[in-house]
Amino acid sequence: VNSRSVPVGNRRPLLGAVAELVNATNAFTPLTRHGYPAIGVFAFGWPTSENAPLVIAGSALGALRRALRGEYRSTSGRISLLLKVVSWVLLAVVHRRAVTSRPYFEDPLSEVLGPQFPPIPPRPGGVWATGRTRRRFVEKTVRYGPYRSNVADIWVRTDLPKDAKAPVLLQVPGGAWMIGMNRPQAYPLMSQLADHGWICVSIGYRISPKHAWPAHIVDVKRALAWVKANIGAYGGDPDAVYITGGSAGGHLSSLAALTPNDPAYQPGFEDADTSVAGAVPIYGRYDWITEGFPERRQFGSVLERLIVKLPFTDNRQLYLDASPITHVGPEAPPFFVLHGTHDTLIPVEEAREFVEKLRAVSQAPVIYAEIPYAQHAFDVFGSARGHYTASAVERFLDWARATRPE
């Protein structure tokens, strides 16, 4: 089509259709995984890949409106409609990949836990369950430490007895160690667990660049200490505390699980118990030191400039100590690690290396679910993968609780 021969107003449907096709293609397979453009690839690909039916519906309604106005009668109009149809086909494939991904969550659990455990239930509600997340269980927000960001939402059923001795899950939010937004992360997981009798504690913590490392992990440890000392008043069991988190929260939750009671990360509360009975890091960062591929070198520069604020060459031990992969050992608690193959923010190789090293030394089970075609943050929405993640994590946690030594 010769753009000079098409009036600007008539080009809008074509330009919009091209944009939709690029977006659908990016959801189908990331346009790039390298450099800062990968952030934009995630920003558009993530919501599209997890909410594909809604994107199709919105596009189809727009196409219907334009058709009623006769905008598809011209050559450029017909081309734009064709591009839209191609986008819908790609998005339909994206959605099918998501709704058929249950075995990738379930099979790793069955291999380790055995077939006697109930399977992950089919996703309820059909495609229109996409995006349904609820905060129905937050009884109150508490302060667990002296800093402004040291707050936590307590997710608990209002009818839970105060002597229930319910298991507890501490949720550590992600955000590149620079965005301390615990809402609305892990809502599908926490609402499901709370509904089934768990207590969930979703925390905030100090973030960079205002605060330098290790303030972040110190706050996570402080939150664990608070939970151990106070959760009994809400009906929780301080001896059955588990931890999870995604992205930076995956890093912090795994580091906390692998460094129980480490005084270096517990200034002023060195004697507090910060051990956990199990960990579920999701699309986390586990290595702050190895430069095995270009993406890690770029990540290292971000650490030096914004998070640690100290050069790696002069502070190698600090970066080593901040890497969960450094702390793997035989005493590690049970782990359930999840990661998507289409993650453009943290490569899936990060999880593979961590799991390999942890399995080589840990005496406890290490379960790894690698989810094909899943972007970063695939569990945030109430999508198919959000449901499968919540059900798989609950199944793992119930097993860890049932087999926990008394």
Which residues does each predicted region cover?
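Alpha/beta-hydrolase superfamily serine-hydrolase fold, recognizing
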Residues: 2-406
